Design a protein with these regions (language model features):
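C-terminal region of N-terminal signal peptides and the immediate post-cleavage residues
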Residues: 20-35
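Bacterial N-terminal signal peptides that target proteins for export
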Residues: 2-14
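Short, flexible domain-boundary/linker segments around small modular repeats
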Residues: 60-103, 124-168, 193-234, 258-294
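Extracellular/lumenal glycan-associated surfaces
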Residues: 41-56, 104-121, 169-186, 235-252
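Bacterial N-terminal signal peptides
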Residues: 11-23
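Small disulfide-bonded, cysteine-rich extracellular recognition modules and tandem repeats
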Residues: 4, 21, 49-50, 88, ...
Length: 294
């Protein structure tokens, strides 16, 4: 091969690698983690980040989970950013290899939305092994109106590896207010440690999780072409958000730069967010006994 041909090959390879990591470009998913091992290990610590409103964006959402498949499509307007949710481990239990490689890159920025009440009755069962060991009972709830749309972002320009990016960039969760039926839950203690590299130096936090306030369910935005192997896992991603309380903090706030990863929102500018202490904790659940496969 001539020197000129070799140079052209290297240039083409470099171009392909660049396309693979750019948030606004399409890329084929080489694979995805199996549904139950991934979903059951995804815990998100959610921080308040009020004060920023993105440029106007109107989105049409379609439900992905089989239990909610009959709910109609809806169009929402992206409002003020309210939370940033980042991946954590509970009580020192790190997700297993091959799963943690995906979990640690799930950062979701949550924006206010509005919509009509669906009044959908559900029974929620915990999936995470740490919570199941605590003996937390199933919760009987009614899913009310949508309150937030949580979409994937990167922090401080640190992108997931290409094979992970092609999966996490499609995670969109629509969060509905809940009416919890029966006796309020007894708060349960947990110790949270950060999994994402950007926040790895943050100390662990002791929290008490109280009542479930929201149920976040998987949706797809019109214009987002989700690969079949990615959809097979994401359709099972349901998180119940619980209010948490913490002790007095000795750690100062952290300022982060957020960049959108989903192709539909790639045109939106980067955002600044300041986080301090967690306000809620998203825990994986199954709806009406429908356990994710795998």
């Amino acid at each position: 091969m001539s020197r000129r041909s070799t140079s052209r090959c290297f240039a083409a390879l470099a171009s392909l690698m660049l396309v693979a990591v750019l948030p606004g470009t399409a890329t084929a998913a080489p694979g995805a983690p199996p549904p139950l091992p991934f979903v059951s290990q995804l815990d998100l610590s959610c921080y308040r980040t009020e004060g920023y409103k993105p440029p106007p964006a109107e989105l049409t959402l379609k439900h992905l989970n089989p239990v909610l498949a009959k709910l109609p499509m809806e169009t929402v307007k992206l409002g003020e950013r309210q939370q940033l949710c980042v991946p954590v481990a509970k009580n020192g239990e790190i997700p297993p290899p091959g799963i943690v490689d995906f979990v640690r890159w799930v950062d979701l920025s949550c924006y206010r939305i509005e919509g009509g009440a669906v009044n959908f009755p559900l029974t929620l069962s915990h999936l995470n092994p740490v919570v199941r060991k605590l003996g937390i009972q199933d919760a009987h709830v009614t899913m009310l109106s949508p309150e937030q749309l949580c979409v994937p972002v990167a922090k401080n320009g640190v992108l997931p590896p290409p094979e992970v990016l092609s999966f996490v960039r499609h995670i969109d969760l629509e969060c509905y207010a809940l009416r919890v039926l029966g006796i309020p839950a007894v708060p349960f203690p947990l110790t949270l440690g950060h999994l994402n590299p950007v926040l790895a130096d943050r100390p662990k936090v002791d929290v008490k999780a109280g009542n479930a306030r929201q149920l976040c369910v998987p949706v797809a935005k019109r214009g987002d072409e989700i690969p079949p192997e990615v959809l097979d896992t994401l359709q099972w991603l349901d998180l119940a958000k619980y209010d948490v309380t913490t002790g007095p903090s000795v750690v100062g706030p952290v300022t982060l730069k957020l960049t959108h990863l989903n192709p539909v929102l790639a045109r939106l500018p980067s955002e600044e967010a300041v986080i301090t202490e967690p306000a809620q904790l998203g825990l994986p659940v199954a709806k009406n006994g429908k356990i994710p496969p795998g």
